[in-house]
Amino acid sequence: MPARSFPRPASLVPCMALAALAACGTCKPPVPPTVVVPEDLKPPAGETLQRTLWATGVQIYECRAKAGTTGATEWAFLGPEASLADDKGAIVGKHYAGPSWEAGDGSKVVGTVKARVDPPGGTSIPWLLLETRNVGKAQGQFAHVSSVQRVATEGGLPPATPCAAAEIGQKARVDYKAQYVLYAPTF
């Protein structure tokens, strides 16, 4: 009877590594159906698409006394907190209050809302067009971004249950996802 040979554990390591790499091909952020962007959210003439990023994070709200009322409360928006991934799923930056988009290389822009459109279905935060200005490094991934579109939003609305006076100061972190489409001047 011929001797049987079995793979040595050391020879399995490269095979397992290759299998893991092959599986990472499916680790990309989900690509939503083609997004039809309303005319109101189109970037200004003279700007071209730089890149699309996928945000995953939370929209943060705080229970506050409602201005101009006696005893009424509301969930007030504080800001987002999200990671930004590229089309391969690699985290390339973060998004936070300002609203700000900051790349891992230190380049950063802050935005001002120019247009707002309710999303299809109305069950998530609005789609936006924001004009941006550079407040970070002069060079880098986000250094030349001049406009940002927020589209394909999921979730992020304030809690449906009103907050009570006893909850003033408490925060609610509501999951959300969105596509951020970055534009830069055409050179």
Name the predicted role of every residue range.
Residues P30-E62, A67-F187:
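Primary mode marks residue(s) on the alpha4-beta5-alpha5 output face of response regulator receiver
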Residues P2-P14:
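Bacterial N-terminal signal peptides that target proteins for export
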Residues A20-T26:
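C-terminal motif of bacterial Sec signal peptides marking the signal peptidase cleavage site
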